[in-house]
Design a protein with these regions (language model features):
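A short, acidic/glycine-rich surface segment
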Residues: 20-22, 60, 69, 90-95
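Short, charged/polar, Gly/Pro-enriched secondary-structure boundary elements
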Residues: 80-83, 144-148
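Core segments of cupin and vicinal oxygen chelate
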Residues: 39-82
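N-terminal beta-strand motif that seeds the catalytic metal site of vicinal oxygen chelate
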Residues: 2-44, 103-106, 110, 159-163
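Vicinal oxygen chelate
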Residues: 42-44, 101-146, 153-154
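Helix-adjacent hinge/juxtasegments
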Residues: 82-88, 92-109
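Short, well-ordered beta-strand micro-motif
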Residues: 76, 87, 138-140
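A short acidic/small-residue loop/turn micro-motif
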Residues: 90, 153-156
Length: 163
């Protein structure tokens, strides 16, 4: 790796700050992080670790709507924040097994009116959806991270209370 031009890096950082960091900002369109979803290779082992070892209460277990037989389960991280997991029984991950324990997606809660407006903005920007259900849109950010905009209140999932 070659030497970094730290002066140029700092100048670029300052240019971006000047262009985008405003002294007075509007309120965010988001209500908060609904949940961050990780992958689990063993549901019970994951529950024993996060609830038993770390003290994060298990709040709900439901079937993953996107993969029949998969469990979607949630832990309370406090302040309305959820940590979620998926398992994918029967799915041969093969060379992708290393993603176990990795990020599946980041779910951001927005109200339904804002959700529709953000959907229009995604459409206008030419962003392709990985999935869309009428209250949930999955898409990739510019670096490939999977993001979900979810028109569900914090602590609810598919109309069920999960917190």
């Amino acid at each position: 790796m070659g030497a970094m031009d730290l002066t140029a890096i700092e100048a670029e950082r300052q240019r971006i700050r000047d262009a985008h960091l405003k002294p007075e900002r509007p309120a965010s369109t988001a209500r908060g992080v609904h949940h961050v979803a990780l992958l689990s290779s063993d549901v019970e082992r994951t529950v024993r670790f996060y609830q038993g070892v770390l003290g994060f209460p298990l709040t709900e277990m439901i079937e993953n709507r996107d993969y029949q037989g998969s469990t979607h389960f949630f832990f309370d991280l406090g302040n309305g924040n959820l940590l979620a997991f998926f398992d994918f029984p029967g799915l041969d991950l093969g060379p992708y097994a290393e993603v176990l324990g990795g990020l599946h997606h980041l779910a951001i809660s927005v109200d339904p009116v804002t959700w529709r407006g953000l959907r229009e903005r995604l459409d206008a920007a030419g962003v392709e959806y990985a999935e869309e259900s009428g209250s949930s849109i999955y898409f990739r950010d510019p670096d490939g991270a999977r993001v979900e905009l979810l028109a569900e209140p914090l602590g609810e999932m598919y109309g069920s209370t999960v917190l």
